[in-house]
């Protein structure tokens, strides 16, 4: 459906003079005008109001052709896709006035600035149109036949600027809406960027009530239309086949989410800052100086930034009221100030929720998903499913954290409704052990259990995803597979370095998913990407069903967001002084947790213990991890300071408060939310998130989905990670609000606690100095290993030569950590690093931009180039760009890890010897 519009005739007030001026319909020109005054072309008119003069619904290209002839030849009319719902005179171009969901057989594309013309002359519209169709065919030959018919129209700058610049009309076999076309061409553009390096279609064409400017440009002052000068037509029609689109294309808006009135209630749960951030100040200034675009552009941006930065909306509205009132009085008297406030809140909330929420659609890119109902009454928080999931399906169980997903599976097993061999898969060893206990199952890492499973003495097993290849011989014998934490399992399968035999694990997973009678996948973080990754692994050969059990498990909880890390430690110390029980989860690292634990014990007298990679072998810590709440009671613990990786999957119900510090974006926001839920009963949550966490880059645009399932699934997860981490803090806030918590956002620091840096450094030095093969001090399990590494890196004769100074230097330099990171980097970046200097590191930055995907896959860290200097530091390379130390350390690292030293890091003597050996091998090969 095309509505044909002309500008509405009437009076317009000149803002400078206050004089009203009459404007006729023909005064509005919807063609670009080229003249001496505007050699680059004066843009087309943009009236505030229109008259709808005609409506057309062409069913074919043949019917579209006369309409195109009219639209291209009359500069005073313009088109909109959609049927007008309002009175046709004096109508504003907004979504509510037009039904934009009318399906049509006509596909309109705006192709703008593609430099690859296929070798055709810039006036050869037929050749260039066929070249576009050829590119579309290379992306999907089923949808876009090479002999597709088309109408091609030269856009205003065609012939004047390089590249393909045209409006291209195709005819579809089925009727589709603009929203469906936006979804289609979003996917087409993703493939096009990977294949050709550019977008094929301009997606703005498919926005609601977007003006379609078809009028040919106007030329004056001796400037000649280049097409007329060449005697070439600006409009051509070629008959041919139809485009073959699937009849179940989803609408783009359904993939982006919609606004719901219930979103407004989220604002009641937030108490924001009464101070503007820099971004909010900048947008307020833009508002104060604006002549137009305030309602649709500036206000939504202002509210979106305010919500992201935690600024209180009521305070913001008081601040902007004077400027907005003046704008309404002088430039837009058709709306009142509350309309602006409501639109800002609505647009900000829509983006806030839909950029963060993980939803399961009923139709996933054409694949229908069947929603199953749970048996839990609305007032009951815990998950109850009376009937076992259907056989022959892949069934996802999405339920809020702490509602009993694994308990439901345990009940099915106990009831005997999951007969035969049962395999539970998860992503951490701690959860393997936990699931083994819950399901009365054997463990993959116990030989006797594997043997008993093989001979049929037991029929239940628990394993990690990285050990799934061990079950290759059991393919066809597994009756039920249960994947616990399935979203995290898939993430590990795609990216985690711990999965050494990745492709074999993928193949075994695929075969078990195909052959198992019952497939159950459970997680609180399931999204469309989760389902697509698992479903596409088996080409959706099994129907997909899902349960969605959402409960507000934090409805009585209060969260407090702090502006800096030091405030968290002050709040934690205060809670201990008040006699409260507290747990802190932080990515600070073992040494900092140990130092803070020492300070808190000294400052408060509380019993504080640290759980991290260097303490899990300590007896007291091991018992806490194994026996959780009961052991905390027995040890009378006041406070735990924990690393998130060590406590993943370990749940407590003991503490009054949870504290969370997030310095880096190495873990996604949903994993930090799981850290917040480490204690299921805590009602006070204190958190700090460093600003550097936002803007995570996983190089999603650099994956080649034509390579197969692995790259397709990696791209799905990488793109979701980037979206959710675009504003890390905002996403985490949504998770808290969604679970019912209230949030107070503080703008002022609470100060600092008295640290124990000096005392802890002395303790760490003593721990390394006095360590032996049989003894390491508590919380310093790596001390003897550090001592041995120190000897190697500083080229000492033996551990007897280690001095306090050596240990101090080792603690400062961290040579093994630097070399280990350098090992991941040097193949990709060494040549670029060598080009850097103390003046610029641009060569490294540019290289990082081009290898984002590879960097993320190697390191698991953000490939955002803004961290380039930090990554050089992590390689032991300072601002002086001196690489002598890291080369020496890396050579030592290779020897420690029994790896050959790369040729580029060899000494002259080593190179000569290596070349000699290679020469001898070559001679031997020739002789053979």
Swiss-Prot record:
A motif (DEAD box) lies at residues 484-487. Keywords: ATP-binding, DNA-binding, Early protein, Nucleotide-binding. Changing residue 405 to E: Complete loss of ATPase and helicase activities. No effect on ssDNA binding. ATP binds at residues 399-406. One of its GO terms (biological process) is DNA replication. The keyword Chaperone does not apply. One of its GO terms (molecular function) is DNA replication origin binding. It comes from the Viruses. Residues 386-516 form the Helicase ATP-binding domain. The keyword rRNA-binding does not apply. Induction: Expressed in the early phase of the viral replicative cycle. Belongs to the herpesviridae oribp family. Displays bipolar ssDNA and dsDNA unwinding activities that require the same core catalytic residues for unwinding in either direction, the 3'-5' direction being more robust. This is Putative replication origin binding protein. The gene is obp.
């Amino acid at each position: 459906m095309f509505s044909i519009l002309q500008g509405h005739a009437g009076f317009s007030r000149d803002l400078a003079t206050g004089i009203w001026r009459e404007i006729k319909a023909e005064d509005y020109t919807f063609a670009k005008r080229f003249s001496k005054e505007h050699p680059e072309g004066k843009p087309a008119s943009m009236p505030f109001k229109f008259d709808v003069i005609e409506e057309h619904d062409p069913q074919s290209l043949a019917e579209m052709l006369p309409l195109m002839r009219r639209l291209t030849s009359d500069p005073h009319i313009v088109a909109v896709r959609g049927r007008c719902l309002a009175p046709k005179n004096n109508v504003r171009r907004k979504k509510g006035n037009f039904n934009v969901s009318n399906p049509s057989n006509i596909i309109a594309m705006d192709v703008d600035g593609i430099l690859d013309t296929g070798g055709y002359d810039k006036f050869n519209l037929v050749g260039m149109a066929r070249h576009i169709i050829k590119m579309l065919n290379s992306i999907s030959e089923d949808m876009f036949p090479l002999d597709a018919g088309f109408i091609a129209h030269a856009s205003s700058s065609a012939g004047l600027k390089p590249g393909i610049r045209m409006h291209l009309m195709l005819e579809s076999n089925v009727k589709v809406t603009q929203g469906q076309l936006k979804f289609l061409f979003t996917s087409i553009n993703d493939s096009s960027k990977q294949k050709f390096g550019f977008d094929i279609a301009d997606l703005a064409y498919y926005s609601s009530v977007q003006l379609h400017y078809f009028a040919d440009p106007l030329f004056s002052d001796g400037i000649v239309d280049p097409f007329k000068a060449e005697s070439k037509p600006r409009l051509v029609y070629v008959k041919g086949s139809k485009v073959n689109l699937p009849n179940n294309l989803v609408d783009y808006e359904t993939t982006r989410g919609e606004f719901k009135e219930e979103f407004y209630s989220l604002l009641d749960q937030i108490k924001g800052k009464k101070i503007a951030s820099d971004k909010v100040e900048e947008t307020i200034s833009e508002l104060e100086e604006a002549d137009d675009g305030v309602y649709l552009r500036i206000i939504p941006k202002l509210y979106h930034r305010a919500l992201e930065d935690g600024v209180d909306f009521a305070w913001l509205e008081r601040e902007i009221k004077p400027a907005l009132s003046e704008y309404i009085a002088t430039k837009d008297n058709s709306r009142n100030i509350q309309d602006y406030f409501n639109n800002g809140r609505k647009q900000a909330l829509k983006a806030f929720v839909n950029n963060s929420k993980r939803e399961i659609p009923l139709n996933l890119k054409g694949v229908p998903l069947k929603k199953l109902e749970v048996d839990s009454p609305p007032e009951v928080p815990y998950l109850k499913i009376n009937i076992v999931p259907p056989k022959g399906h892949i069934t996802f169980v999405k339920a809020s954290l702490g509602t009993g997903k694994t308990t439901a599976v345990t009940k099915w097993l106990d009831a005997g409704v999951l007969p035969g061999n049962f395999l539970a898969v998860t992503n951490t060893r701690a959860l393997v052990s936990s699931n083994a206990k819950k399901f009365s199952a054997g463990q993959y890492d116990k030989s006797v259990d594997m043997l008993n499973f093989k001979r049929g003495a037991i029929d239940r097993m628990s394993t990690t995803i990285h050990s799934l290849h061990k079950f290759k011989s059991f393919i066809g014998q597994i009756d039920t597979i249960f994947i616990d934490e399935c979203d995290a399992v898939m993430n590990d399968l795609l990216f985690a370095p711990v999965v050494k035999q990745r492709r074999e694990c993928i193949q075994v997973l695929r075969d078990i998913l195909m052959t198992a009678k019952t497939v159950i996948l459970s997680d609180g973080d399931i999204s469309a990407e989760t389902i697509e990754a698992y479903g596409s692994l088996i080409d959706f050969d099994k129907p997909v069903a899902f349960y969605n059990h959402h409960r507000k498990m934090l409805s009585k909880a209060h969260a407090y967001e702090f502006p800096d890390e030091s405030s968290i430690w002050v709040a934690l110390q205060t809670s201990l002084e008040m006699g409260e029980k507290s747990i802190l989860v932080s990515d600070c690292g073992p040494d900092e947790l140990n130092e803070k634990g020492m300070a808190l014990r000294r400052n408060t007298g509380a019993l504080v213990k640290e759980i991290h990679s260097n303490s899990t072998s300590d007896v007291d810590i091991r018992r806490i991890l194994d026996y959780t709440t009961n052991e905390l009671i027995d040890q009378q613990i006041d406070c735990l300071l924990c690393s998130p990786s060590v406590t993943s999957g370990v749940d407590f119900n003991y503490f009054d408060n949870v504290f969370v510090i997030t310095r880096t974006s190495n873990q996604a926001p949903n994993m930090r939310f799981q850290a917040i839920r480490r204690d299921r009963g805590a009602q006070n949550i204190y958190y700090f998130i460093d600003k550097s966490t936002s803007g995570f880059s996983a190089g999603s645009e650099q994956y080649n989905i034509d390579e197969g399932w692995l790259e397709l699934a990696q791209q799905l997860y990488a793109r979701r990670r980037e979206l959710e981490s675009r504003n890390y803090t905002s996403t985490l806030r949504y998770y808290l609000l969604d679970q019912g918590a209230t949030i107070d956002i503080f703008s002022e620091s609470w100060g600092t606690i008295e640290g124990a840096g000096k005392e802890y450094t002395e303790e760490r030095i003593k721990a390394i100095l006095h360590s032996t093969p049989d003894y390491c001090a508590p919380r310093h399990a790596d001390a003897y290993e550090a001592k041995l590494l120190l000897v190697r890196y500083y080229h000492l004769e033996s551990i007897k030569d280690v001095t306090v100074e050596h240990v101090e230097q080792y603690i400062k330099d961290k040579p093994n950590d630097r070399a280990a990171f350098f090992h991941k980097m040097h193949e990709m970046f060494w040549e670029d690093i060598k080009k850097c200097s103390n003046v610029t590191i641009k060569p490294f930055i540019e290289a990082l931009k081009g290898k984002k995907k590879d960097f993320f896959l190697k390191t698991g860290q953000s490939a955002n180039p803004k961290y380039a200097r930090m990554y050089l530091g992590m390689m032991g390379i300072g601002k002086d760009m001196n690489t002598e130390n890291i080369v020496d350390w890396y050579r030592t690292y290779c020897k420690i890890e029994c790896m050959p030293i790369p040729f580029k890091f060899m000494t002259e003597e080593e190179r000569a010897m290596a070349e000699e050996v290679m020469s001898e091998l070559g001679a031997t090969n020739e002789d053979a």
